[in-house]
């Protein structure tokens, strides 16, 4: 049996024995949040923010995970870095407000907040399906690496557990008390209702 993909009329179709079978997508299915690591060999050594992605790309990597989830299109840290360069940094640091502005400019369905300082408000956005960037210092979790400054992506909240993508460590889940014990500086949420 011969099977191939066709893009006739802009709609992907599978053809088998000359008959087109339309490809069906579940548009209502929630988008998955990928786990990208800033140290990944595919992009870690790429120059970024005066250093490289492995060293300085926590915000870029978090933005790539968020934008991939929000758009349903794959935006790896490599692709995002090649697209935005250093324009989403300020004084060599990741500027999540600039990343949010870039995302909104490229997808008119997205909205973002200003800086948020209330943990419960940030978790509320994560519980609604928005992507929330969290700026923190110290350890994200007991036994984890200590950071002088770090950006993570809070991508879920079920009322008791925060689902976090740490671009340095991967997926981390924190309960309410663990989340409250993190030294958070600010949050910024982006998404659509």
Question: How should each PLM-predicted stretch be described?
Answer:
Residues 1-92:
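Active-site-adjacent structural segments surrounding the nucleophilic cysteine of cysteine proteases
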Residues 67-193:
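Conserved active-site-adjacent core of cysteine acyl-enzyme catalytic domains
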């Amino acid at each position: 049996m011969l099977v191939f993909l066709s893009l006739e009329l802009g709609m992907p179709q599978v053809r088998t024995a000359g008959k087109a079978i339309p490809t069906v997508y579940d548009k209502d299915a929630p988008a998955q949040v990928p786990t990208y690591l800033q140290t990944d060999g595919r992009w870690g050594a790429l120059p970024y923010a005066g250093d490289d992605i492995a060293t300085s790309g926590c915000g870029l990597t978090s933005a790539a995970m968020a934008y991939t989830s929000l758009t349903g299109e794959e935006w790896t840290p490599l692709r995002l870095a090649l697209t935005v360069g250093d324009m989403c940094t300020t004084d060599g640091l990741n500027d999540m407000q600039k990343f949010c502005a870039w995302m909104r400019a490229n997808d008119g369905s997205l909205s973002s907040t200003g800086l948020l300082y209330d943990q419960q408000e940030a978790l509320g956005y994560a519980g609604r399906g928005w992507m929330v960037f969290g700026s923190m210092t110290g350890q994200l979790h007991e036994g984890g690496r200590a950071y002088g400054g770090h950006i993570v992506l809070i991508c879920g909240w079920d009322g008791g557990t925060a689902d976090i993508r740490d671009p340095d460590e991967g997926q981390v889940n924190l309960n309410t008390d663990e989340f409250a014990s993190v030294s958070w500086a600010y949050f910024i949420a982006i998404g659509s209702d």
